[in-house]
């Protein structure tokens, strides 16, 4: 409110000396302070066409927001960028890193993840640039059961928003000498971005029916936006390190893929 009054007073003074200059300056102030975030607050899969084509956006600007000490490996980011160039046909892909303090949470709910994005995200769609936000967290997802083999490595919850639970990624990688952090990071990033591509049945039409099913809250079998084919990147359960590795089932089923569209 204080800032608004200051701008109003400034506008009155400028109007006294020059009407045309006051109008122009006011428009400039509004243009620099207003950011249109609406294109980044849609449902998961709503930007699949824009990600997979160059019709509306020919550049990807990806914000890598990470808690101090939980920055992803350079190897994973290189492989991830190569994966995006291969599947999006966008050659102009820029990564910007944003180091953040820890939210000091034992676990993160979907709403808490969205609230953190609201506070920390700095990149949004502009012109022909499509902006993506990826948060590397120092806290596991709500409801993880590492001993029981059920954890969430990553989740998508809006059309351009993703979280990687880096603390869980590292814990998984430490369980076997046959896998490393880069392997788990790369697989998780590629899997979750597959959902932003609209997979499975999240905005991109299936050529062949390959969606797996799981029980919903009512005990009914419904499509869970994952793949039912062996060896598919979009399976809900990802296998690392072969027979000597650790297999954990993803907890990022329909409740995450449906996500939230505002906030």
Predicted regions: what they are:
Residues 15-18:
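C-terminal motif of bacterial Sec signal peptides marking the signal peptidase cleavage site
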Residues 20-132, 136-142:
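Propeptide-to-catalytic entry region of secreted or membrane-anchored zinc metalloproteases
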Residues 52-56, 154-156, 225:
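Short glycine/proline-enriched loop/turn "hinge" motifs that connect secondary-structure elements
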Residues 117-123, 149-152, 220-221:
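Short, P/G- and charge-enriched loop/turn segments at secondary-structure junctions
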Residues 126-205:
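Active-site-proximal segment of zinc-dependent metalloprotease catalytic domains
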Residues 261-263:
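Pan-zinc metallopeptidase signature
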């Amino acid at each position: 409110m204080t800032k608004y009054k200051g701008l109003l007073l400034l506008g009155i003074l400028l109007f006294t000396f020059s009407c045309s200059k006051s109008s122009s300056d006011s428009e400039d102030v509004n243009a620099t302070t207003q950011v249109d975030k609406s294109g980044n607050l849609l449902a998961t899969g709503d930007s699949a066409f824009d990600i997979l084509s160059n019709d509306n956006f020919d550049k990807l600007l990806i914000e890598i927001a990470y808690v101090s000490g939980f920055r992803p490996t350079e190897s994973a980011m290189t492989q991830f960028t190569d994966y995006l160039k291969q599947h999006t046909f966008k050659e102009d892909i820029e990564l910007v890193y944003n180091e953040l303090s820890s939210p000091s949470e034992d676990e993160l709910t979907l709403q808490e993840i969205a609230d953190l994005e609201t506070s920390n995200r700095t990149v949004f769609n502009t012109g022909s640039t499509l902006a993506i936000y990826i948060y590397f967290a120092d806290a596991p997802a709500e409801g993880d059961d590492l001993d029981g083999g059920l954890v969430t490595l990553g989740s998508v919850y809006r059309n351009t928003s993703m979280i990687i639970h880096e603390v869980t990624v590292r814990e998984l990688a430490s369980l076997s000498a046959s896998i490393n952090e880069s392997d788990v990071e790369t697989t998780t990033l590629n899997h979750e971005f597959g959902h932003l591509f609209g997979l499975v049945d999240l905005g991109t039409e299936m050529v062949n029916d390959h969606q797996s099913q799981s029980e919903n809250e009512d005990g009914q079998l419904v499509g869970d936006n994952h793949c039912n084919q062996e060896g598919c990147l979009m399976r809900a359960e990802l296998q690392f390190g072969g027979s000597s590795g650790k297999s954990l089932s993803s907890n990022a089923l329909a409740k995450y893929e449906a996500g939230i569209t505002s906030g």
